[in-house]
Amino acid sequence: MALVEDNNAVAVSFSEEQEALVLKSWAILKKDSANIALRFFLKIFEVAPSASQMFSFLRNSDVPLEKNPKLKTHAMSVFVMTCEAAAQLRKAGKVTVRDTTLKRLGATHLKYGVGDAHFEVVKFALLDTIKEEVPADMWSPAMKSAWSEAYDHLVAAIKQEMKPAE
């Protein structure tokens, strides 16, 4: 992950090739983003079943995960934000989620005790989902690397906001 310091802002170096790979795959993914987003979250819970307990709307719910409307909405929001942030990374030179959103994400992730292991599970699920959803001849080590780096930048931006209230 290449970072370039500029005053107090941290600029991201994301290559033209990486951007092209992310944009090409995102163009395919966003056509069915609601269903893909749900599969992404179901994969998270498959890898880490206890993760579902981190979501208040899933605790004590009798609704199957794949039919839970709140999970569908949340999954869509997370998936689209992650993919859009990745798609804008090179052009913007930084993660382009609004500051208020980053602050809220940081506070929420801190409140629920989200740690590095959780972010790694989500990263695994994201990369695996993208691999499954793009045409087989499109997926490559370079595409995996591009998405991985983009995700790492988003997580770094969220972690910067994961500070206890003073």
Swiss-Prot record:
Comment on bound cofactor: Binds 1 heme group per subunit.
Keyword Cytoplasm: yes
EC assignment: 1.7.2.-
Binding site for heme b: S56, K70, H74, R104, T108, H109
Keyword terms, alphabetized: Cytoplasm, Heme, Iron, Metal-binding, Nucleus, Oxidoreductase
GO molecular function, a single term: oxygen binding
Catalysis: reaction(s): Fe(III)-heme b-[protein] + nitric oxide + H2O = Fe(II)-heme b-[protein] + nitrite + 2 H(+)
Cofactors demanded by this protein: heme b
InterPro entries named in the record: Globin, Globin-like_sf, Globin/Proto, Leghaemoglobin-like, Leghaemoglobin_Fe_BS
Keyword NAD: no
Gene transcribed to yield this protein: NSHB1
Position of sequence motif Homodimerization: 46-50, 116-128
Pfam family of the protein (one): Globin
Protein name as catalogued: Anaerobic nitrite reductase NSHB1
Mutagenesis or variant effect for H74L: Increases 1000 times the dissociation constant of O(2)
Tissue: Expressed in coleoptiles, embryos, leaves, seminal roots and roots.
Family under the similarity heading: Belongs to the plant globin family.
